[in-house]
């Protein structure tokens, strides 16, 4: 009984292996048509779109002046005069300066730290 079971298993494995080779070789020889994806239109909407240019620069991004930086307290810090400029953290005075100077990305309010207030 065990021998019969092993023999049938071997014959089935040989049959499956040979039929897969026929399908693979027919597909490689272009005898079979590839299966079309009926949901391809559905996934077309999920493709990433090109990123549009932002009106302001985030922290660490390139800038030309303080008005290019997004955050209220962000300042445009330049190395060697006007070269290699990027947005970095500023302070309360930076925010006040941006409020008076900038037409776009103007801060609505300037955050003030609670560290220097006297209690008591």
Curated annotation (Swiss-Prot):
It comes from the Eukaryota. Disulfide bonds join 56-70, 63-76, 69-87, 78-85. It is found in: Secreted. Residues 1-19 form the signal peptide. Expressed by the venom gland. Belongs to the neurotoxin 05 (agouti) family. This is U13-lycotoxin-Ls1f. It comes from Lycosa singoriensis.
């Amino acid at each position: 009984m065990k021998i019969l079971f092993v023999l049938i298993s071997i014959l089935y494995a040989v049959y499956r292996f040979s039929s897969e080779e026929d399908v693979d070789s027919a597909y490689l020889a272009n005898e079979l048509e590839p299966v079309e994806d009926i949901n391809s239109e559905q996934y077309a909407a999920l493709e990433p779109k090109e990123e549009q240019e932002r009106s302001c620069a985030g922290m660490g991004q390139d800038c030309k002046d303080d008005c290019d930086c997004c955050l209220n307290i962000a300042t445009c810090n330049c190395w060697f005069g006007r070269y290699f400029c990027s947005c970095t953290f500023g302070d309360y005075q930076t925010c006040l300066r941006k409020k008076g100077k900038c037409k776009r990305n103007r801060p609505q309010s300037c955050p003030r730290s609670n560290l220097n207030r006297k209690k008591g």
